[in-house]
Amino acid sequence: MTIVIPENYHAEKLLKDHGIVCKTPEEARKEKFPSIRIGILNIMPQAETYEFNLLYPLGRSILQVEPVWIRLKTHNYYSTENPHLENLYVFFEEAVAEKKLDGLILTGAPVEDIPFHEVIFWDEVCEIIDYA
């Protein structure tokens, strides 16, 4: 149905080219039915590039979806541009401070060859999962 994205979102044209309706948060607030807020903890390498792969199926839903991009305090995002993270992604506490999340998507890639509990940001991920 519809994806709620900020103005000038980098993948807006691509989403529209694939038949996804895009609205700004201001436009979405005027709708009769509220958006569902889906927290997306995207720890994939090159997060910016991977966002379309998440938004496209969400945009095919019968519901209006507002993605809430979440970043970790304890993870270094080496392969994603810092301005993109700072402009679009929020820390988990900020994501839930204004309004609860209706769902959570957790993405990642097995780029390290160590057990989960040894990954430096694992405790923070567990806190977010506990919330969900």
Protein language model features and the residues they cover:
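Catalytic nucleophile loop
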Residues: I128-A132
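N-terminal beta1-alpha1 cap of cysteine-dependent amidohydrolase-like domains
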Residues: T2-H117, F121-C126
